[in-house]
């Protein structure tokens, strides 16, 4: 049962027109000089000379405009071709991967990975792990979820830790490096946590392994890259730790949370019944201990509201997402963590009492509209 309770709490258009205007202006000047020289003439020949430069000027103006339109259309078509080439390149890379995600559906870390995979339209299979027996991941010495198994040709790679999974796969999509090489950039490291327990940490897990040109194309500047990393870590180190005390805040909320966990999870009939009642009672008391460990307020909703509003303030009013016009990895991480509360009282309170709902719905829409 100790494993079961981890299911929701696991650890140039203007340029083109100028190109058209310049010849027209030059020919107009020539036309005015010709008209002055012919002004003393008379008869049909003079009339013809008088009208000829005007016709040439009008023709030149039309030609200049057409040239401008041509260059504009050519520029737009080339831009579309480049976007199509990048999309095709990413599609080609993603089609070379066969991904299997081992998860608990209600785990915030697993939800982060699903948000990333769905937004980037990466096809994957899901294996729902039984939180009690965990037989589905008996092949792995790493016993936490999420785990992603990635088949690339003859190479099969195991990716552990939600942030490593996301960073490695994003690096793969942007750079095209072999995944077997990329995962060597995120070596595991043994450490002892505040409770004296040995844990596995991963170096560089918020860093994408890109060269200078790739990083410039993706971020545009160092500030955007640093900001993304900062808030991805914030989601892991702070936001995720507020979820459990909020969804298990009262006995009724704890029971509702475990009812949701049992419905969405991979439990046997007896296991499900035990998890719903015994697990709910256990997590109600454990959440109190977690509240003290993370120095949360007596009313943990206040910490949840404060965190949500802090995130909204960081995104700001001048951009729809922290990533600008589309979600970046920080947007997807925060969204993925919060999404596990959907359908619970804590989520409804969050939407009512903070300013996060417009941003949340924009991310939800962006993921839903990702090309499949």
Protein language model features and the residues they cover:
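C-terminal helix/juxtamembrane-tail motif
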Residues: 361-372
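A positional/structural detector of protein chain ends, strongest at the extreme C-terminus
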Residues: 1-3, 371-372
């Amino acid at each position: 049962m100790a494993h079961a309770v981890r299911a929701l709490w696991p650890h140039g258009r203007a340029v083109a027109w100028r190109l058209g205007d310049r010849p027209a202006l030059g020919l107009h000047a020539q036309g005015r000089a010709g008209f002055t020289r012919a002004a003393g003439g008379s008869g049909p020949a003079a009339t013809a000379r008088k009208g000829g430069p005007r016709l040439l000027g009008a023709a030149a103006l039309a030609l200049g405009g057409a040239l401008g339109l041509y260059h504009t259309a050519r520029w737009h078509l080339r831009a579309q071709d480049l976007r199509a080439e990048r999309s095709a390149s990413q599609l080609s890379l993603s089609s070379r991967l066969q991904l299997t995600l081992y998860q608990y559906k209600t785990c915030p870390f697993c939800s982060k990975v699903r948000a990333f995979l769905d937004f980037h339209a990466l096809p994957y299979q899901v294996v729902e792990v039984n939180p009690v027996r965990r037989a589905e991941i008996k092949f792995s010495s790493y016993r936490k979820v999420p785990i992603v198994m990635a088949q690339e040709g003859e190479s099969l790679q195991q990716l552990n830790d939600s942030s490593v999974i996301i960073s490695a796969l994003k690096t793969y999509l942007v750079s095209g490096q072999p995944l077997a090489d990329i995962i060597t950039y995120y070596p595991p490291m043994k450490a002892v946590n505040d409770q004296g327990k040995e844990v596995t940490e991963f170096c560089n897990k918020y860093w994408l392994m890109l060269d200078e040109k790739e990083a410039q194309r993706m971020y545009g500047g160092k500030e955007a890259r640093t900001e993304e990393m900062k808030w991805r870590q914030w989601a892991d180190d702070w936001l995720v730790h507020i979820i459990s005390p909020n969804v298990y805040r009262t006995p009724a909320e704890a029971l509702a949370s475990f009812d949701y966990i049992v419905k969405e999870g991979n439990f046997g009939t007896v296991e499900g019944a035990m998890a719903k009642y015994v697990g709910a009672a256990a997590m109600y008391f454990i959440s109190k201990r977690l509240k003290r460990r993370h120095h949360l307020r007596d009313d943990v909703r206040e910490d949840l509201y404060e965190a949500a509003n802090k995130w909204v303030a960081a995104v700001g009013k001048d951009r729809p997402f922290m990533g600008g016009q589309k979600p970046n990895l920080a947007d997807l991480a925060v969204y993925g963590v919060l999404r596990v509360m959907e359908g619970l009282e804590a989520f409804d309170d969050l939407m009512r009492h903070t300013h996060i709902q417009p941003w949340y719905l924009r991310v939800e829409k962006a993921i839903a509209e990702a090309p499949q």
